[in-house]
């Protein structure tokens, strides 16, 4: 039974899902106050290092460089730098709970949502072991390990900080849901990617993580 068939069967069974709570949301102050003081200080200090983070732009030619020269480092330095900074800001806000990291978090959310593709240039293909496209097709997302990781990152931010973000504007989390639907849910359910495994197709570490 394929995933979509199994999901439809479960939903039609009338059974309820258990509340999703993999870790404490920012509203659970008891959980965050219970952290060791040294750890809280370290988390806030890491967030302070990236206050005002400029989120450097990724140019189309940065993506194109992999096909042209084989260089993936320049693109990935910017790509992962954005995500690491955003993670530090989110954790710092969860611990401190004063709102001073929120503007930079919102900037980071929209920067990620406005990327043309979440996949890395070396993974920009739909069939395994075929040449990568030189640019991402924003109308047909590719699900690679890091596209799925970006989706998970934004989903976790929404889970952790939804209340705070919605107080500023409901359009922040609405944008996250929109991007997750277009970039993650729909291609996962409607497309077949080589790492999914079907019949004799080989699977890999991407299979469980994606």
Segments the model singles out, each with a brief description of its role:
Residues 1-22, 29-66:
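Low-complexity, Ser/Thr/Pro/Gly-enriched N-terminal "stalk/linker" regions
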Residues 29, 76-210:
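Aromatic-lined, polymer-binding surfaces characteristic
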Residues 44-48, 73-77, 118:
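Generic hydrophobic, helix-prone segments enriched in Leu/Val/Ile
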Residues 49, 69, 124-126:
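A generic structural micro-environment signature
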Residues 61, 68-75:
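Amphipathic alpha-helical segments and their boundaries
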Residues 65-68, 120-122:
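Generic structural "secondary-structure junction" signal
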């Amino acid at each position: 039974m394929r995933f979509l068939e199994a999901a439809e069967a479960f939903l039609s069974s009338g059974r309820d899902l258990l509340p999703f709570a993999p870790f404490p949301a920012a509203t659970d102050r008891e959980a965050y106050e219970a952290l060791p003081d040294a750890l809280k200080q370290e988390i806030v200090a890491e967030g302070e290092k990236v206050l005002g983070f400029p989120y450097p732009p990724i140019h189309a030619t940065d993506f194109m460089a992999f096909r042209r020269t084989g260089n993936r480092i320049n693109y990935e330095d910017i790509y992962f730098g954005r995500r690491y900074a955003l993670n530090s800001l989110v954790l710092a806000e969860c611990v401190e709970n004063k709102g001073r990291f929120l503007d930079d978090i919102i900037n980071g959310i929209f920067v990620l949502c406005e990327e043309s593709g979440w996949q890395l240039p070396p993974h920009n293909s739909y069939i395994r072991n075929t040449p990568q496209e030189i640019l991402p097709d924003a109308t047909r997302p590719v699900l690679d390990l890091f596209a799925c990781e970006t989706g998970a990152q934004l989903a976790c931010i929404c889970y952790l900080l939804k209340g705070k973000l919605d107080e500023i504007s409901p359009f922040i989390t609405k944008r996250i849901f929109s991007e997750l639907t277009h970039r993650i849910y729909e291609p996962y359910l409607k497309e077949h990617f080589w790492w999914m495994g079907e019949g004799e197709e080989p699977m890999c570490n991407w299979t469980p993580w994606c």
